[in-house]
């Protein structure tokens, strides 16, 4: 089954790296990229995202704020917060809103594990 994944990171290099890893794992999935939370929200009105990879540190709203907004609109959406800033508080806040924390640099293995769990979560929600 094909899915659409939202990748939000203010670093173009980080977005490209995540998109490349995603393409290697699931070449038929659609990847939509945004540089800020505001850009992602504005894209959401014209796109239907199945899951999201969100950078934690971004200008304006951070990834956790965006994740909370996305979860409010779609509670079953699998979301990963991606950051090099591996603090227990950030991990706990991500978990509290139902998001997964992934450490930067994002590896294909870590991304693959998140995506497998995300697909299982989506299938369970659609039953």
Model-identified regions with their sequence ranges:
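Short amphipathic alpha-helix used as the core "switch/output" element in two-component signaling
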Residues: 42, 64-76
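Active-site residues of response regulator receiver
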Residues: 55
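Acidic, metal-coordinating helix/loop segments flanking the phosphotransfer/catalytic sites
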Residues: 33-51
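Two-component/phosphorelay signaling modules centered on CheY-like receiver
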Residues: 12-32
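The feature encodes the CheY-like receiver
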Residues: 59
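Acidic catalytic/metal-coordinating carboxylates
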Residues: 36, 62-65
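Alpha4 helix (beta4-alpha4-beta5 surface) of REC/receiver domains from two-component response regulators
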Residues: 65, 86-102
